[in-house]
Each structure stands twice: as structure tokens, then as C-alpha cells.
Amino acid sequence: MSGAIFAPLEGLSALDAASGHPLVCPLCHGQYERPCLLDCFHDFCTGCLRGRATDGRLSCPLCQHQTLVKGPSGLPPVDRLLQFLVDSSGDGSEAVRCANCDLECSQQDAETTYFCNTCGQPLCARCREETHRARMFARHDIVALGQRSRDVIQKCTLHSEPYIMFSTDKKSLLCIRCFRDMQGESRAHCVDLESAYVQGCERLEQAVLAVKALQTATKEAIALLQSMVEEVRHSAAEEEAAIHALFGSMQDRMAERKALLLQTVQSQYEEKDKAFKEQLTHLASLLPTLQVHLVICSSFLSLASKAEFLDLGYELMERLQGIVTRPHRLRPAQSSKIASDHRAEFARCLEPLLLLGPRREVSTVGGANTLSGGSSPMVLKTPSCPSPVGKMSGSPVQKPSPHRFISTKVLLAEGEDTPFTEHCRHYEDSYRGLQVEVQNLKDQVQELHRDLTKHHSLIKAEIMGDILRRSLLLDTQIASEYASLEGRRAIFQEIWEDSYQRVATQQEIYEAQLRDLLQLRQENAYLTIVTKQITPYIRSIARVKERLEPRFQVPVDEHAEHGQNMYDETPGRTDPGCTTEKRDKASEPNGSSWSLSSLPEGPSLKNQDHLRPKLEAGDEGWRAGSGSKGACYQA
């Protein structure tokens, strides 16, 4: 049972068909019997999982995720939510007996059998007339059995009193005696059942929207991965065709190299194909889980009463939140391009033959290259790296080669005073500065992303704007450095004509420098994309935080206001009375806040009074650093 039911994946339609019924076990294909929930949110019957645990760990038959199990049974706990849905789905098909005469009524007799919502008992037609004939039963709510209400008042298991309250802190139903036994602090979290039901429905709706968004993203990721698998197949075919075409013209000298290149392509294809299919299998097992839980939510809302909703609804919300917050690999881990660098390999193989001909066969006219233009012709027919063509547009580039650093160090260690040596010294300094700035931005964005996803911290939108501004400025600097480096190509090509050996080393270093700048710019572009994607969520979370917790409503620019207060107090240094008046004026609350929604005057003043110690502390710190001039403010 290693996920074989998801093996024949031919498209999204196959994934939809593999989802199955939410109340049917994927192993035995029957209705759940005491369903057990694993850590991967897959459910199975108790009998289907019995005996599968090994060393306290239970592998999911679908996705192979390990679940820790405790106890001698070796089974996870029973899924109360799914068990409720199973029991509720069978209510309509179960035989009902009259509470008075024990007459069994089938489902076909649902219209001729009655149910007293007041008594909470089913009655046949004859017993209804006999037992509820008296006037004292006139107010009883008697309906047809098929129309009976599910909002039956449940009673507390401890005090046998009806539930009237719900604790939002402990997520539990309370009767009047449970409410009286609670402490005063806990009573503040108690609301009536109707209000708790409305709040719970709103929170469940938000959780369902998050799951639907994840479902949409998963479908898009699956479609992308399926297309990339096809692209890998086409790319491998194209690469093999190119290798065969080049091999045909040099068959005698490159027979061994041909086999090596084909083996390289095949290994890359197998690696990428395996990686994409593994990720596709993982997402294929995730999509049915999302669909099943969405159906569970819909069924739960239609079947559960208010008390049952409050009893199991928060468990459902936690489960949905757990599904959404789990790490899901929705983006491809690598590209679908297969590159064997066959031209360079063939050039190395034919290097002895190429060295026999004349070295200077191409002139240096038009050697300069622009960011958007084509590649310039190489001076020599050497196995050096090709000039980049339009790579600054964001296409994938290679990572910095360690060989470039070693070659640069060797070149600088020779101590020769040449134009290229001076260029390398200047380039290394500027490149290190750009690399440090990019790394700092990467670390800052990673830290903010971790705080946002794991710690759910409130991040100011100004921080994201500053990161975006620095990223755009850094992109301009890298583009300028790249253009400056590209503009020196013609100068260096004239020098490279003097010696082939020196040209081979210098060109390799030069192209590696260009690739390093391309890598830096690509990383910076990724930072810019991530920052733009995170910024709307941070602003949205900030607005929600400000509305839910007024203590987060601080002035728009506390530092700017503080600086303005300092500026206003400067003319009053010669007048002690003016200083006191200015300080009193600066301590008045400001009506602006980060919240977009207008708030009542009371909470706003309280929030700003809460911030006064911070402003006063800032004033004291500024006065302490002003030396003797601060004596006027301290007075």
C-alpha cells in the first residue's frame, strides 16, 4: 500500500476521480468503521490500520507519512468529526421504533410517523393520538419524522442541565451550574450559544476559504508539474537530437564522447523526471485530502446542530488550519531544462584539431555587446564560454564558479601590472560589496518571512517598502556594473589577441564575472518578487490586527511626530515656561493611527495614553544626549 492507488495519473480528471467519497475508506472501499486520523490528515478504518504500526510509528498507506502512535493498540485516536458525519449520514436509513408501542417504522413510513421535538421521542400515528390527546400536550411541537429538528437541546453530562453558554477560551459547552462554578476571569470568555454559533461559522468560513485557495494552488502546481514532465521529455529529445547531429560530422573522433554525453543527458532526465514525479505524487495525495475536507465541512455544516457544531467545529477549524500551515511543495524544485553542454565537450574533444588552424579568423569589429543585443563574435575559436545573450532579463543563470575565484587569485598573485589585472582588483571590491548587500537583503526577507509564517508577528508595511526600495536600487547598481563590465569587452579583446593561453584564462574569468552578476541580479529579482507578494498580506494582517486588538493602533509615524516635537521645542529653549507648554502640547494624543477604519474616541485616547511613556522615554533619552542644553528641558 505505497500510494499505488494514485499511480495512473493521466491528468487532473484522474486526480478528481481518485478522491473518492469522503465517508468511504480508501483501503477497504467501504463506509468508515471507527475512522482513525493520521498526522497527514488521511482517515482509515480501525480494522484497516490494525497491525501496521512498527516501533511506535504508523506509515500512511497513501503518502507514507510517519505517524507516532501510543498505547498497546498501536492505533491513532478515533476521528470524532468523521465519526459524527458517519453516524449522521446513517440516521435517515436506520429503523425507528415508536417510543410508546415499540412499533418499528421504516424509512418509507417517515411521513406517517411523527416526532415530538418537545419530548424528543418518535411516535407512530396511533400513539400520537393516544398519548398527546390531553390539553397539556397541546403546546408540544409534533412534526413528521422526516422533518424533525436537529436542534435538540442537549444536557450537561455532569449536572444534567441544558447547555446555555459556550466558553470561547476552553472551547466547551456550559450549563448554568458550570457557568456558576467558573472563575470571574473565565466568565468573560463565555457567550450564548447563538453568538458562539455565528462566530464559529465565520471562523469556519475563513478556514474553508484558505483550504480552497490551497486547493486551487495545488491544482495549478499539478498542472505545471505535468507540463514540466512533458517539457523534460521534449527537452531530452531535442538535446539528444542535437548531440546526434553534431556527432555525425565528427563520428571518428568523438565516439567515446558521444556515449558519455548521452549518458549525462539520460542521468539528468532520470533525475529530473524522478524529482517531478515524486513531487507530483505528493501533491496528488494532497489534493484528495483537500477535497475530502471541503466536503466534510459542507456536510458538517448541514448536519450538525449548534451544540454539535460548537463541540466539533473548532476541532474542524484546527484541522483545516493544520492542513493549510503544513509545508507543501507547490513550486518545482528545479528547472525542466536539460543541458549537457555538448558543444563545449565536443570543443574540448576537438581542441587538438582546432589548434592546428589559424587563430585569428574573426575580426574584432562589433565586439561590444549590450544588455538587449546579440552576442559579439569571439576573437579566437577557443573553448571559452559563450557571451551571454539577453541574460539580464531574468533567465536562469549558473551559480558563481569556484574556479573563477581561484583563477582570479592566481592572476592577481602574479603581480603583473596589466589593464585586466587592474580591472579584476576593482571588480572584486565592487562585487563583494554588491554580494554583501544582496545577502543582507536575503537574510532580512527570510527572517520576515519566518516571523510572518511561523510566529504570526505583526510586520510594518514600511519595512517591506524599505526592502523593496533597497532591492530596486541594488538592481540598478548591478545593471550599471554589468553594463560597465560589458562595455570593456572590446578593450579586453584587443589584449586577448596577443596570447592564446592568457586569453583562455582571462575570458573564463570574465564570463564567470558576468554570470556572477547575473546570479546576483536574479537573486535580487526573486527578492523583489517575494517582497511584492508578501507586502499585501502583511498590510491585510496589520489591518485585521488593528481592528481586533486596539492596542496595536499606534500613530502613523511615531518617530516623525517625535522629531516634529523636538523641532517645536527648539525655539523655546530660552524660555522655560515655553518648554513646559510645548511638552504638554506634545503629550496630547494624536488622532491618527494605522487603522484604516475609524475607531471610537474612547479606545483611541486609551491607546495613545498607553503610548505616552514611550514618547516621554524618547524625550528623556534625547535630552540626556543634548548635554548642558538639556537642562532647560529637564527644568
Curated annotation (Swiss-Prot):
The record's section on PROSITE patterns has: ZF_BBOX, ZF_RING_1, ZF_RING_2
Q: What is the superkingdom listed in this entry's lineage?
A: Eukaryota
Q: A Pfam family name for this chain?
A: zf-C3HC4
Tell me the CDD domains matching this sequence.
Bbox1_RNF207-like, RING-HC_RNF207
Q: Where does Zn(2+) bind?
A: 98, 101, 127, 132
Which residue stretches are annotated zinc finger (B box-type)?
93-145
- What keywords is this UniProt entry annotated with? Coiled coil, Cytoplasm, Metal-binding, Zinc, Zinc-finger
GO terms of biological process kind = positive regulation of gene expression; positive regulation of membrane repolarization during ventricular cardiac muscle cell action potential
Q: Name one GO molecular function term.
A: Hsp70 protein binding
The coiled-coil regions, if any, are 422-460
Zinc finger regions typed RING-type: which residues? Answer: 25-64
Q: Where is the composition biased (Polar residues)?
A: 589-598
Q: Biased composition, Basic and acidic residues: where in the chain?
A: 553-562, 607-622
Q: Where is it located?
A: Cytoplasm
Locate the region Disordered: 553-635
Q: Where are the transmembrane segments?
A: none
Q: How does it assemble?
A: Interacts with the core-glycosylated, but not the fully glycosylated form of KCNH2/HERG. Interacts with DNAJA1 and HSPA8. Interacts (via the C-terminus) with HSPA1A; this interaction additively increases KCNH2 expression.
Cited PANTHER family: RING FINGER PROTEIN 207
Role this protein plays: Plays a role in cardiac repolarization possibly by stabilizing membrane expression of the potassium channel KCNH2/HERG, or by assisting its synthesis, folding or export from the endoplasmic reticulum, in a heat shock protein-dependent manner.
- The name of this protein is RING finger protein 207
Organism per entry: Mus musculus (Mouse)
Q: Which gene encodes it?
A: Rnf207
